[in-house]
Amino acid sequence: MAGHSKWHNIQARKSVQDAKKSKFFTKVTKELMLAARAGGADTALNQRLKSAIAAAKAVNLPKDKIDQAIKKGTGELAGENLEEVLYEGYGPGGVAILVEAATDNRNRTVAEVRHLLSKGGGAMGESGCVSWMFSQKGVFSFPKTFTEDQLMEVGLEHGAEEIMDEGEVWEVHCAPADFEPLRAAFEAAGMVSEDAEVAMVPANMVALDLEAGQKLLKLIDMLEDNEDVQKVHSNADLPDEMFG
């Protein structure tokens, strides 16, 4: 099960993002609404909502705001008429970029995303141009205080598909449907991950030099600062010198 995806290195930005948690209130609130609308308010039956609540708590969104967003999603309270949209394009160095958005105005959002991609050295593409390069996976990052054998012992029984050595951390992948059961199994065994999310993981990476890597991170930051953008994914393999 050992491997090396290098997907983890672009996640190293999270330490910087965490300093700006307040900007994620809007994003996690939208995800709570969308998740509740899609699968109802019962977290036992709605894994997406369970993950959304965990993400909301991670950025310290108040409980009353969490409850309010869920009620807006189920229709118990009036709320925005949000639509989920996926935009595809290319970034510096020719890397593939996926932009997940939640919007009440498609025309506004597509224009803004197109503008930001162009401004950041990329370009909007047609639907389907890069999404085939990615698979949706549950992704966990564990410190090396745990051994691969320990992770395998718990993971293999609860849906883990792959365990990879990513230098300072172990990375565990699973199918999206197994994400919450696997997280619960790890936590029950006292194995709390440093990071866990359902993400679009690329099949192959595109290596970038320092200049292109810095341009890409600037582009991703611009996209993530847009209030309609929920998540940004790429298949960039960033140089180690960016994280020294």
UniProtKB/Swiss-Prot annotation:
InterPro entries: Integrase-like_N, TACO1_YebC-like_2nd/3rd_dom, TACO1_YebC_N, Transcrip_reg_TACO1-like, Transcrip_reg_TACO1-like_dom3, YebC-like
Example of a GO cellular component annotation carried by this entry: cytosol
Keyword DNA-binding: yes
GO molecular function, one term: DNA binding
This protein's UniProt keywords: Cytoplasm, DNA-binding, Transcription, Transcription regulation
Taxonomy, superkingdom: Bacteria
PANTHER family registered for this protein in UniProt: TRANSCRIPTIONAL REGULATORY PROTEIN YEBC-RELATED (PTHR12532:SF6), TRANSLATIONAL ACTIVATOR OF CYTOCHROME C OXIDASE 1 (PTHR12532)
Family: Belongs to the TACO1 family.
Protein's recorded name: Probable transcriptional regulatory protein DMR_30850
Organism: Solidesulfovibrio magneticus (strain ATCC 700980 / DSM 13731 / RS-1)
